[in-house]
Amino acid sequence: MRFLEILGILVCSLDSVTGRVLPKPRDVPGVLTELVTMKQQWDKGAANTSYVLSGDSTTANGTVPNSGGWGNGFCASLSPGTPCINRAKNGATTASFRTDGSWNMTIESARQEVANGRKTWVTVQFGHNDMKVMTPEAMGVNLMKFVDEIRGVGAEAILITSLTRRNFNSDNATLDDTLGPWANETILISEQKQTHLIDLHKWSVWYVEKIGPDAAHRLNRLPDDNTHLNANGTTVFGRMVADLMLLGLSPDIGPILPNISLSSKIWTGKAVY
């Protein structure tokens, strides 16, 4: 049985702990094995593709040692020399990101990459801080404006749902998911604006529940910090974002390099670290 088929069976099986039916096999990035053959195509496109990342601390570059968001790990998955500009900012909401000038820097980066002749992808992932100060609907209004302005400079928008927190319920099997409404709003806006979507929230919840609290907390920046990532966490979830892009957007997404060893562990629900 091929690796692709094994992944489909494993991820679609009934979860024995939670009793929930997991997503359909076609959602599973088992196709990565076959995407390896496209490596030459990605390499050729490297000079003509760029990425600009926006969001909060779960995407941002780390400001202290052994920390960072998934953006670090995602940029590391690209062919060498591919521009990957991380404009995400710690503590940001969809409102503060605009008022403090971070959004202007994001758009200007995208504008320059487009002017340089590159196909430019701009990722947008918020929710962790928005949930503290605004409704999902208010965040959605801000996301719609972001998408319009990304398109206005000739770039492609990718909305990404919030990376899960790693707070487990008392059963030590399921997560206390407080981000769901904001993730659902992101999905709704992607449908309304007919733009690209990466459902990182769904798949990070699935993965964290599969590996359990002990392994999940080994990805924490600090022992009791279930939101922010250490260097290992950035590698795992950066790879997850890369794989989801390959699954949902390939071959248009550009020079993302496969990592079958790491992906195999992630998509069979095994702890990497």
Positions of predicted regions on the chain:
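Serine-esterase "nucleophile elbow" of acetyl-processing enzymes
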Residues: 20-90, 107-115
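Oxyanion-hole/transition-state-stabilizing segment in secreted/luminal serine hydrolases
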Residues: 100-141, 165
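Charged helix-capping and loop-helix junction motifs
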Residues: 137-145, 178-183
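Fungal secretory targeting signals
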Residues: 1-23
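Extracytoplasmic/secreted cell-surface and envelope-processing proteins
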Residues: 61-63, 94-97, 130-136, 160, ...
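Surface-exposed amphipathic alpha-helices with a cationic face
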Residues: 144-154
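Catalytic His-Asp segment of secreted/periplasmic serine-dependent ester chemistry enzymes
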Residues: 164-273
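Structural recognition of the beta-strand scaffold that forms the well-ordered cores
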Residues: 50-55, 59-60, 82-88, 119-126, ...
